[in-house]
Amino acid sequence: MADSGPAGGAALAAPAPGPGSGGAGPRVYFQSPPGAAGEGPGGADDEGPVRRQGKVTVKYDRKELRKRLNLEEWILEQLTRLYDCQEEEIPELEIDVDELLDMESDDTRAARVKELLVDCYKPTEAFISGLLDKIRGMQKLSTPQKK
C-alpha cells in the first residue's frame, strides 16, 4: 500500500466547516515527522506538530464526482425526511450506488433499496423512483479512469 503522506507523515483530516460557513468541506493536512525538513534550522519546534496543507488528487472525472456528491447529499436529505430525524439519527444503512449500478435492471435495484429501507415507516416509493432516475446514466467510481 502507498505511503499515507510525504516523508512518512500521517494524514490528518480537519473537521468540515459548519453549514453556511462557505467552506469547501474537510481539508487534508500532513503531519511532518520530528526532524523533517520545513521545521526550521534548529530541528523540532516546541510548538507541536507542523501542519501543512497537502493536495489530494484522483483520476476520476470531476463532473462525475460532482454528480455523485450531489446524489449523496440528495440521498441524505431524503433519508432525513423518510425517517423524520436529523442526519446523525438516521439508522445505519448504506445505499451503495456502485452496487446499484452493477445490477441488471431497475426492478432489482428497487428491490435492493426497498430491502435496505425495511425499517422505514413512511412510504418509500417516491424516494426509490427518484433515486433510480438520478443514478440512470451514472458511471461507477470503484475503479479510476485510465488516461
From Swiss-Prot:
Domain of life of the source: Eukaryota
Presence of keyword Cytoplasm: yes
Keyword Phosphoprotein: yes
Record PTM Phosphothreonine, positions in chain: T57
One Pfam family recorded for the sequence: PP1_inhibitor
Bias type Low complexity, positions: 1-15
GO BP, one annotated term: innate immune response
Modifications after synthesis and translation: Phosphorylated primarily on Thr-57 by PKC (in vitro). An unknown Ser is also phosphorylated by PKC (in vitro).
Disulfide bonds: none
Family recorded in the similarity comment: Belongs to the PP1 inhibitor family.
Biological role stated in the UniProt entry: Inhibitor of PPP1CA. Has over 50-fold higher inhibitory activity when phosphorylated.
Record protein name field: Protein phosphatase 1 regulatory subunit 14B
Organism per entry: Sus scrofa (Pig)
Upper lineage: Eukaryota, Metazoa, Chordata, Craniata, Vertebrata
